[in-house]
Structure formats: C-alpha cells, structure tokens
Curated annotation (Swiss-Prot):
Top-level taxonomic group: Eukaryota
Bilayer-crossing regions: 528-548
Predominant subcellular localization, coarse grouping: membrane
Bias type Low complexity, positions: 624-633
LRR repeat ranges per the UniProt record: 58-82, 83-105, 107-126, 127-152, 154-179, 181-197, 198-223, 225-246, 247-269, 270-293
Residue span(s) of domain LRRCT: 305-356
Disulfide bonds: C31-C37, C35-C44, C309-C334
Subcellular location: Cell membrane; Endoplasmic reticulum membrane; Cell junction, Focal adhesion; Secreted
Source species of the chain: Xenopus tropicalis (Western clawed frog)
Protein name per UniProt: Leucine-rich repeat transmembrane protein FLRT3
Membrane topology: Single-pass membrane protein
Coiled coil: none
Listed GO CC annotations: axon terminus; axonal growth cone; endoplasmic reticulum membrane; extracellular region; focal adhesion; growth cone membrane; plasma membrane; synaptic membrane
Positions of the UniProt region annotated as Disordered: 624-648
Length: 648
C-alpha cells in the first residue's frame, strides 16, 4: 500500500470517528451550578439543598446528596432516567417516606438518619436491582412495612435497620439476604417463620433488644445453615439460645445478658465456632465438658461473671492447663469462696477447691417431706415477680419442718453467707428429677416481699445468689419437679431463712480483680499520709515567712541609705522620656529660682524664657540630638527609661 493511499485512509477514519462521537459532545449536559462533577461522581452534599438539582449528567454513576435538607417532594421525576447511577447517598436529610423516582438500576442506597416511617412495595419495586439498603436511624416500625414489600428485590444482600422502632422481624424478607442488622430496636419475640427462608444469611445482629428465652422460638435459628456470626448482646437471655446452627457458625456473642445457667449441651456440634463471648452475665459455674465439641475454639471471653470456684469448677482448671497456647481464655477469676477470691482458676491447686467438704461449719440444714401428687408446671425460665416487701427481724436459726407424712422424696438444703451480697446454696435430692424451682425473697414472710424465681436442672446441686442486700434477712425456698415436668401436689416448698453477712465482717471490695482488692489497704495509709503532708506544709510556710521577714528587713535598711528612690512616682518616667508633659518638674519659687529678664526692655505678656531644672548629676530631663548617643539610660520596650538608672 502506497503512502498516499495510507494517508487517505487515515483521514477518512478520523472523519468518520469525528462524526460518530460528535453527537455525544453536543448532547452532553453541564454539571449543575450548585454541584461539583468529577467524571461519574456528582458531589452535591453539604449545601443545604431542599431538592435534588436538575440537569445531572447522563453519565453519572454515584450521587453524593448527604447532609442536606432534601424532602420527598424534592426528588424530581427526571432522576429516574439516569440509568447509569448505581450508588446514591441520601443520609441526613428530611425524608419521611421511602423515596420514589430513584434510578431503576441503583444497587446501593444510603438513607440513614432521616425520619422514614413507611416502606411500601410501590417504592421498593422501582429499584429491583438494589443490593445494599441502609435504613439505620429512622422511624420504621413493624406495622409500617407493607406485607411483601421486598418481594421484588431478589438481589438484596445487605439490609440494615438498626435503631428503628421494630418490635418483630419484618416478614417476607428475600432469601438472598446475607447480612441483617436489627440492633437497638424493640424486638421482644422472634417467630420461627421470621427467619426460616433466610438460608443464605451469614451475619445476624440483634444487639440491644428485649429478647428473652421465652421470646425465641425453639427452632428459630435452625434453618440458618450458612450463618457464621450471631450477636445477641444486651438482651435478657437467662441461658444461651437452644438449637444453634452448628454447620458454619464461627462467632457467637452473648455478653451483657442475664444468663445464670449454661446447659451441658448449649454448644453441642458447634465444631466451627472459634470465638465465644459470655462476658458480663451472672454465671457462677460451667458444666463439665461444655466445650468438648468446640474443636476450633481460639477465643473465649468470660469476664465479669461471679465465678464460684467450688469443687464443680475443678475440671475447668484441668481443662485450662491442657489447652494449647493458641487458645486465648480471659475472665475466669474467682469471686467466691472468700479464700480464693481474686485468684484465677488456672492458678488454683486442687486443695483450694475443697472437694471433700464444700460447705462450711456455719451451714444450716433443713429437711422436709413432700407429697407425690402433681400439679401443672410453669415456664422453664419464669419472669421474676415483685411484690411490696414487708421485712421482719431476721431469725437465721429458725428451721422449718413439715408434718411427718408418708415419705416419697427428701430434699436437704444447706446455705452459707459467702459475702455481704452473696449466699451459697447447695442441696441433695433422694431421687432424680428433671428440675427444681428455686426462689428467694427479702424478708421472712411467705406472702409479702420481693420474690425472685428461677428453674435449675436436676443435675445441679448448688447455686450462688448474688446482688443481695447486705445484712438483710432472706427466705429461700425450693420446689421439686417430677420427670413429667410438673410440680408436686401441694407445692409444699423446702424453705430456709438466713441473712447476708454484715458489712463489717467482709472486705468492701466485690470486684474480681486483684488490683481493686488492694484499694482498701491503700485507704488505711491515708491518715499517715495526711499527717506527713501537713508537717511538710507547716515547715514550708515557716521557711517562707522567715524569707519574707529577712527581705523586708534588708529592704528597709536599703531604703534608708538610698533616699533618692523613696517616693518616686511612676509618671516621672514618662516626664523623663519626653512622652508626657509634667508641670510639677517646673517649679517657680521666689527664693530658689527667680525669673530674670534678658534685657531691661519691658517684657510682654507672652514672652518668657523658662530655665529648665537639671538634676544634680547633670543628666538632662529631655532628649536632644547631642546627648542621645552618650546617655547611659536604659529603656524598656515602650521607650520609657528604666527606673533603676534614672534619678530625680
């Protein structure tokens, strides 16, 4: 091919390309004046806008509209024609309904911190490609979400509804959801149907709600076969939820609940679990072998629980000592008995567990006989019942015995006051049973008083009551339950009356940390420190007074020898510097400085020659061109002579 032919071909190609792309430049929209455009990113945020500006370029992909005052009426209909927009930031605006007229291909929508109350199918059906929907910090309630509102959003993966007004989990969520955040709402119940279709869910956050064990369906989590993280922090659970999905669960957060019991099979089959947190609960002991199935456990946090390091916790010490170094366990520090309080379980020797005699000499024994007739049982974890208390004087030696009748079951209770706020309870039963109801109330009256109840399983033989009133009487009762999970005939309780120890008998420290236990001993040295500090302060004041007296005395002698500096006024400095006229330095006296005429001609009224009074040392009071260079007078920054070098 010749050079001329090649050049002609290139020219035609350039011409065709120009005709091909020129319409795009002709039709391109300029950036709105109130916004800034950078390629496909349109920045209209933080401008106090009440509506979305028109004229957004067609090639826009991301709209930044946050921190304005845009309301629902401020979303124009032409916004829907922006087919390339995939991401919109509309948080911190004034929306009160789910916005419409949004681009149909948007995949990520941020609507946090508005006042959105309703979510309708009509609004969500306009964005069928949505993948991430952020609705945190709004006013969405369960009744304000239309049934089936999400049925067309088959690509939705992330749904954030934190800090709203939900009381239940919305029904009909798409099964494609992988992460669901519902923390800090008002959810008290979760029906099994709510989550049964979310088989792809990987992360579920339910922190800060009103959930208890009765509000969770028995199989509510079983279908979540792909769940890897479950968080139930800051709820009202009394034990870990049952039937956790064991296939893929890796993280389980249960801290800041009301858990006082952990069933032996609570974590059965959770072979993939590597992080478990049960801190800030009321757990006193752990059943042996509870962690046997946790083959991948590497992080176990059990801080701030009132661990009772009795014989039943000896296995925990042996288990801790057998763990490999990669397993990190934190928070297993004893609070009771008193002899081991503040010590970590791992550091205890077997003698400190006192497995031969777990109850001290000051225990109280109660034996009672119960009948074999049965009544229907109540819920497994009853809610505590509170009544008006009527406290009577304590009588810790009183023993209750029922009238001897044909014996079917015998229960023996032993109690011991461990600290000013805790009472240790142990019991023995003659026959195996499913569970026992344990209750305690402030005062002696079986009718009046603040009553708290809980259910303990039949395999347990001890319990630690915590957070009690110091030096107060308590009535502790137990009712056995048959294997049929129903109460015995007349619900005759096994009761004992005791009281917590007085404050003076125990160290006031109730924390689990050794450093905090040492604080009372630090306080005992306060009087000695105060005496030493007072003595040092007194000596310092005395020395300061002597120094002041000495300076004052020497200053008086010096002032008598240097009379020229006495009575000097500050304004003399200004007079010497020539910055202020001071008539007091020009004295007209008949005896010392008479005014002498220059000649004998009559002196007119306005012609006078006044001689300046010079100081004895010959230094002129006013500057002149001759003396300025030879003067030894020192000046401050303001041009005023220093008083240490000027004399009057």
């Amino acid at each position: 091919m010749s050079t001329e032919t090649w050049n002609l071909f290139v020219a035609w190609a350039q011409l065709l390309l120009l005709f091909r792309i020129s319409p795009q430049y002709v039709n391109a929209k300029p950036c709105p004046s109130v916004c800034r455009c950078d390629g496909g990113f349109i920045y209209c945020n933080d401008r106090d806008l009440t509506s979305i500006p028109s004229g957004i370029p067609d090639d826009a992909t991301t709209l930044y509209l946050q921190n304005n005052q845009i309301n629902n009426a401020g979303i124009p209909s032409d916004l829907r024609g922006l087919d390339k927009v995939e991401r919109i930031y509309l948080y911190r605006n004034s929306l009160d309904e789910f916005p419409i007229n949004l681009p149909k291909n948007v995949k990520e929508l941020h609507l946090q911190e508005n006042n959105i109350r309703t979510i309708t199918y009509d609004a969500l059906s306009q964005i069928p490609s949505i993948e991430e929907l952020h609705l945190d910090d709004n006013s969405v309630s369960a009744v304000s979400i239309e049934d089936g509102a999400f049925r067309d959003n088959i690509f939705l993966r992330l749904l954030f509804l934190s800090r709203n007004h939900l009381s239940t989990i919305p029904w009909g969520l798409p099964r494609t959801i992988e992460e669901l955040r519902l923390d800090d709402n008002r959810i008290s119940t979760i029906a099994e149907i709510s989550l049964q279709d979310l088989t792809n869910l990987k992360r579920l956050v339910l922190d800060g709600n009103l959930l208890n064990n009765n509000g969770l369906g028995e199989r509510v989590f079983m279908n979540l076969i792909n769940l890897t993280e479950l968080s139930l922090v800051r709820n009202s659970l009394t034990s870990p939820p049952a039937n956790l999905p064991g296939t893929n669960l890796r993280k389980l957060y249960l801290q800041e609940n009301h858990m006082n019991y952990v069933p032996p099979n609570a974590f059965a089959d959770l072979t993939q679990l590597y992080r478990l947190d049960m801190s800030n609960n009321n757990i006193t002991a752990l059943p042996q072998g509870i962690f046997d199935d946790l083959d991948n456990l590497t992080q176990l946090f059990l801080r701030n629980n009132p661990w009772y390091c009795g014989c039943k916790m000896k296995w925990v010490r042996d288990w801790l000592q057998s763990l490999p170094s990669k397993v990190n366990v934190r928070g297993l520090m004893c609070q009771a008995p008193e002899r081991v309080r503040g010590m970590t379980i791992k550091d205890l020797n077997k003698e400190l567990f006192d497995c031969k005699d777990r109850i001290g000499s000051n225990t109280i024994h109660v034996t009672t006989t119960v009948l074999n007739s049965l009544l229907p049982a109540q819920g497994q974890w009853p809610v505590p019942v509170t009544k008006q208390p009527e406290i009577r004087p304590p009588d810790i030696n009183k023993i209750f015995r029922t009238t001897p009748i044909p014996v079917k079951k015998i229960i023996t209770i032993q109690v011991k006051s461990i600290t000013t706020e805790t009472i240790y309870i142990s019991w023995k039963v003659a026959l195996p049973m499913t569970a026992l109801r344990l209750s305690w109330q402030l005062g002696h009256s079986p009718v009046f008083g603040s009553i708290t109840e809980t259910i303990v399983t039949g395999d347990r033989t001890e319990y630690l009551l915590t957070a009690l009133e110091p030096e107060s009487p308590y009535r502790i009762c137990m009712v056995p339950m048959e294997t049929g999970n129903i109460y015995l005939s007349d619900e005759t309780p096994v009761c004992i009356e005791t009281e917590t120890a007085p404050l003076k008998m125990y160290n006031p420290t109730t924390t689990l940390n050794r450093e905090q236990e040492k604080e009372p001993y630090k306080n005992s040295s306060l009087p000695l420190a105060a005496i030493i500090g007072g003595a040092v302060a007194l000596v310092a004041i005395t020395l300061l007074a002597l120094v002041c007296w000495y300076v004052h005395r020497n200053g008086s002698l010096f002032s008598r020898n240097c009379a020229y500096s006495k009575g000097r006024r500050r304004k003399d400095d200004y007079a010497e510097a020539g910055t202020k006229k001071d008539n007091s330095i020009l004295e007209i006296r008949e005896t010392s400085f008479p005014m002498i005429p220059i000649n004998s001609d009559p002196i007119s009224k306005e012609e006078f020659i006044i001689h300046t009074i010079f100081p004895p040392n010959g230094v002129s009071l006013y500057k002149n061109s001759h003396s300025e260079s030879s003067s030894n007078r020192s000046y401050r920054d303001s041009g005023i002579p220093d008083s240490d070098h000027s004399h009057s």
